[in-house]
From Swiss-Prot:
GO terms for biological process: carbohydrate metabolic process. Pfam families: Glyco_hydro_1 (PF00232). This is Beta-galactosidase. The active site is at E206, E387.
Amino acid sequence: MYSFPKNFRFGWSQAGFQSEMGTPGSEDPNTDWYKWVHDPENISAGLVSGDLPENGPGYWGNYKTFHDNAQKMGLKIARLNVEWSRIFPNQLPKPQNFDDSKQDVTEVEINQNELRRLDEHANKDALNHYREIFKDLKSRGIYFILNMYHWPLPLWLHDPIRVRRGDLSGPTGWLSTRTVYEFARFSAYIAWKFDDLVDEYSTMNEPNVVGGLGYVGVKSGFPPGYLSFELSRKAMYNIIQAHARAYDGIKSVSKKPIGIIYANSSFQPLTEKDVEAVEMAEYDNRWAFFDAIIRGEIMRGSEKVVRDDLRGRLDWIGVNYYTRTVVKKTEKGYTSLGGYGHGCERNSVSLAGLPTSDFGWEFFPEGLYDVLTKYWNRYHLYMYVTENGIADDADYQRPYYLVSHVYQVHRAINSGADVRGYLHWSLADNYEWASGFSMRFGLLKVDYGTKRLYWRPSALVYREIATNGGITDEIEHLNTVPPIRPLRH
């Protein structure tokens, strides 16, 4: 048996926009994402699926059923978020000392008077309902990580359709320092309201996806779908500042640890000659971001500067991992290659002969070990695996995927990395952003018509892991690449 440390926790992660809607009264129409997926032009262009989040799994109304299933599975940790737009659906008065002419936001004033002013504008019904959800979670002995931001912005801060059409007069989301100020205030306010129920905080989930797919990978179907490398860099600059100011804001009302959750790929060289390409890819896609919020090092234009107001703004790292990226060195640097990682055909095999998921993502568990150990060796901050899972409606690969990736976490811990939990993505099927309901990541299968939850076989495998604190001898045989099925005709 592969046993984990006694204090290690197995659990799950989920997001509000993807899971909450689906029961009467659960709709949240006041976000950029809601407007984006309902936009007729986006739907007709195939940028989004046409599936609508208000038909989702219904966690807002049925959270106790979700928690019942998690408890039966033996899960002991959960990462959830508060939807910003539910708490502040309407535009707030501008923050004190706000100056939109300044590129650098080095401080956002947070005090008791400011928090009380925010409280006057907050949606009390939403606050009370979130408290009911979190209290129910805690009553079951589940350790709780509260994440502040999992992609949707309030419409009063970001109108993605206007930006997509080239209107940058506002509201422009992460292109504006106003969003930096507001996120700091929101994060401090949420910590002020819920600190008695929270064990640890995360400021954001996968900020690199927001800054990348919204402005560079515009065919991904992510808002605002405005192609501009310059604006992508501007958005990431503001996101880094927003994390640091939110960290300060939360610390002003709480002593709990604060992390950030990041989308990771394991960069692998095509040949031995491409090791330098891996180093460049890791810096561009990972270390540049974390060097900013840990060491204070950030690029301003073409110049690297050190900002003390960014330094040391992180207590732990949330590692999201699904697959790898194979890179090759070029004259100008490096390039990522199709046929591996995220760039494969769906339900097929990669160029390496490895099976791929319903999403076309390659089965590559050893990449999780690579990511965890490299984070540990560079920063020595403790970690959680905050997302790991597979789109697999048939649940054929998921049992293998689950055991193989949990094993790689065990390897990383044995190599000295401080990893304190594994949170699977996800407990139940949900709304997979631009792909709608077609991509099913759940241990529990959702019947979207009845909102009933059904246990997939992989849920039984995860229960075996969670209740025994590791990979037992009975399921160790799943620590391998799943046998590849014949191609369907």
